[in-house]
Amino acid sequence: PTVLSFVFANCQTVCPVLVRNVTRAARTLGPGTVNIALVTLDPWRDTPAALPELAARWTLPEGSRLLSGEPENVCRLLDTLQVARERDLKNGDVSHVPLVMIVDARGRIVYRFSNPPAEWIIEGVRRVRSGS
């Protein structure tokens, strides 16, 4: 399974907690058990070139993916996944729900959580892995 979440580097509120919970879940589940993919909500500042520094700062587990790209492409993906957000054009910050999705091997979104503790993520991944 893949744990998919949506964050941005300059977020000082929910993103650090979200990243911490996703990271804790992945480490508890163990290497090779789950894929982590974090999609930026701020592709204007979180450019592909900035992502390695961000991954190091967040101490993401080995194999985690931070994803960005052209703003129009990232926004299209976020819209397709129904990720609600609002960008403040004055300071660039993004108001958003702390969303985590668990995606199965077929690419189906099996769970969609708002601000889940690590334990919910762990249980969701275990259920997806077991097929229940």
Feature locations, PLM:
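Solvent-exposed coil/turn segments that connect beta secondary-structure elements
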Residues: F8-A9, V39-W44, L60, E70-E72, ...
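Structural micro-motif
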Residues: E62-S64, C75, L81-R87, D93-M101
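Thiol-/selenol-based redox modules, centered on thioredoxin-like
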Residues: D88-S132
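Structural microenvironment flanking redox-active thiols in thiol-disulfide oxidoreductases
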Residues: V17-L77
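Hydrophobic beta-strand anchors of alpha/beta hydrolase catalytic cores
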Residues: V3-L4, I36, V100
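N-terminal post-signal-peptidase region of extra-cytosolic proteins
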Residues: F6, R87-D88
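Alpha-helical elements of the RecA-like P-loop NTPase motor core of helicases
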Residues: T13, A49, C75-R76, E119-E123
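Short active-site neighborhood of thiol/selenol oxidoreductases, capturing the structured segment around
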Residues: P1-V22
